[in-house]
């Protein structure tokens, strides 16, 4: 039973998502046309909810969207594990398919695969590799190779991307990612994160590898008028009432 007008502290969807029509259309177009995208804004402005919405809208028989959050990754190795697991899992519809893709495309790495109770959704990959070896390029090429094999396009969305700035030898790692990803034709990337200053530095500093990597989108505040409509609508949906005037006062008090 839903009796609370609003959802707090988590990504939202459906009726709990408001506005962002322009940004939704832009991201959807970029996804469908293979345009790399960088999404930048302060924390709690709805980046994750927006990207997840576009992921759902973009998914089709000819376009697969992969989503992963690397907030818990503290090293290159952990990044590669998370990246490979997400790409294999979210581009395959059958257990046999993703295991075959792992066998074919990661053969030089000999991945260790652990299955849970639900193999299609509950599995993890541990990669026996040296991050400095050329073999890691096989992991970064996974989206492109799978896309070409299936005759589709793939978009990889990476949340909390600013975490890579904390890795040891981060600049060398960034160079490796950029050098591989920028040459891919059937795979594109949407990179975003919650620490605006780090994201700005990664993508706006000329001396860093990801400078001018893609279409940079700065997420603006949602307008007061849209917030008022949303607040009033959510109150009505849960059997409550609030006037537009009072909703407007709330918006102004918290600076939207």
Predicted regions: what is each one?
Residues 42-45, 49-154:
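P-loop NTPase nucleotide-binding core
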Residues 29, 56, 60, 85, ...:
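Short, well-ordered alpha-helices that flank and scaffold nucleotide-derived cofactor binding pockets
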Residues 126-195, 204:
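Conserved Walker B catalytic segment
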Residues 34, 71-75, 161-163, 194-198, ...:
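Conserved nucleotide-binding/hydrolysis micro-motifs of P-loop NTPases
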Residues 1-37, 42, 240:
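A short, basic N-terminal segment
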Residues 254-256:
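The conserved phosphate-sensing helix
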Residues 61-65, 185-187, 212-215:
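Short glycine-/polar-rich loops that comprise or flank the Walker A/P-loop
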Residues 201-252:
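Helix-loop-helix "sensor" segment of P-loop NTPases
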């Amino acid at each position: 039973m839903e009796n609370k007008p609003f959802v707090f502290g988590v990504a939202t969807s459906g009726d709990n998502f408001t506005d962002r029509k322009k940004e939704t259309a832009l991201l959807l177009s970029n996804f469908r046309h293979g345009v790399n995208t960088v999404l930048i804004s302060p924390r709690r402005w709805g980046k994750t909810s927006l990207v997840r919405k576009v992921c759902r809208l973009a998914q089709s028989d000819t376009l697969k969207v992969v989503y992963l959050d690397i907030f818990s990754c503290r090293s290159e190795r952990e990044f590669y594990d998370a990246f490979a697991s997400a790409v294999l899992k979210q581009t395959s519809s059958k257990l046999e398919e993703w295991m075959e893709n792992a066998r074919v495309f990661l053969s030089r790495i000999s991945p260790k695969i652990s299955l849970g109770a639900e193999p299609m959704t509950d599995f993890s990959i541990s990669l026996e590799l040296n991050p400095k070896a050329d073999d890691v390029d096989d992991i970064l090429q996974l989206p492109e190779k799978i896309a070409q094999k299936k005759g589709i396009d793939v978009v990889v969305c990476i949340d909390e991307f600013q975490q890579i700035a904390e890795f040891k030898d981060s600049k060398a790692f960034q160079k490796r990612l950029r050098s591989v990803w920028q040459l891919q034709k059937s795979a594109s990337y949407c990179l975003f994160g919650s620490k605006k200053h780090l994201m700005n530095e990664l993508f706006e500093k000329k001396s860093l590898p990801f400078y001018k990597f893609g279409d940079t989108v700065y997420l603006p505040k949602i307008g007061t008028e849209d917030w008022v409509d949303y607040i009033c609508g959510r109150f009505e949906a849960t059997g409550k009432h609030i006037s537009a005037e009072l909703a407007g006062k709330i918006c102004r008090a918290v600076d939207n």
